[in-house]
Amino acid sequence: MTAARLQARSLSVGYGERLVVSDLDLDVLSGSVTAVIGPNGCGKSTLLRALGRLLPARSGSVLLDGERIDRTPTREVAKVLAMLPQSPQAPEGLTVAELVARGRHPHQAWYRQWSPEDEAAVASALEMTGMAELAGQTVDELSGGQRQRAWISMALAQGTDLLLLDEPTTYLDLAHQIDVLDLVQRLHRESGRTVVMVLHDLNLAARYADRLVAMKDGRIVVSGPPADVLTEANLLEVFGLDARVVPDPVAGTPLVIPIGHRHRTPER
């Protein structure tokens, strides 16, 4: 049986007095690609931030390799887990190489500054993402897809095998969405990285993830393989969406086809 790298146990998380995620249990299996889906405001990003130790738990816990993440030193967590928030912003004038080099901070200390190992990690990350030729450009000069690959490069330079991505395709056109998700899939296949990402596009989630977690109102409604999660009944329950689900003619994964008002069969 595949072990869980990251777990939530009776996890509740919120902002101020508002509870967003309530009494939630989740297992992220080692070597899996998990996509968290659900309507706006259901708690997807809040859950991811809690899993990445960016938000403290109100109650319950997050476990990283079986140990409570809130009791693990920050630097040690950063050597194992990398998280990219939604729409990250780089300081003006920062080059791609300088951004990627920031991924090496968890591996440095006052007695050990920049090393040949750091240099090699940055070069490898740039090569893996196809960004080596753009290393000298500033981040603000890049296209949306290139910018996202630069941030992923930084996460790769961090040297972790657990990657959390909060809506990595936001504000990208379809071609760049595919480009970024192809990269994530390749990184997973070549290195066995465990990936958790929040995605809005259900069809892309089904195509690129081997496990879906569907949330509503701060709770997990259903989780499992895409074919088990993206059913017409579940789409209606989670999204209030009347839709048909057919096999994707390219990938064979579930393809969600929403039904507009004009195309609904009249009730008898």
Language-model features: where?
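Catalytic Walker B motif of ABC-type/P-loop ATPase nucleotide-binding domains
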Residues: L163-E167
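Helix-to-loop junction immediately C-terminal to a conserved catalytic motif
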Residues: G52
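The feature captures the beta-strand-to-loop junction immediately N-terminal to the Walker
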Residues: I37-P39
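Conserved ABC transporter NBD signature motif
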Residues: G60-R68, V77
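Conserved ABC ATPase signature
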Residues: Q113, T138-L142, Q146
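Conserved ABC ATPase "signature" region
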Residues: A101, P116-L134
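Conserved structural motif at the start of ABC-family nucleotide-binding domains
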Residues: L6, V21-D23
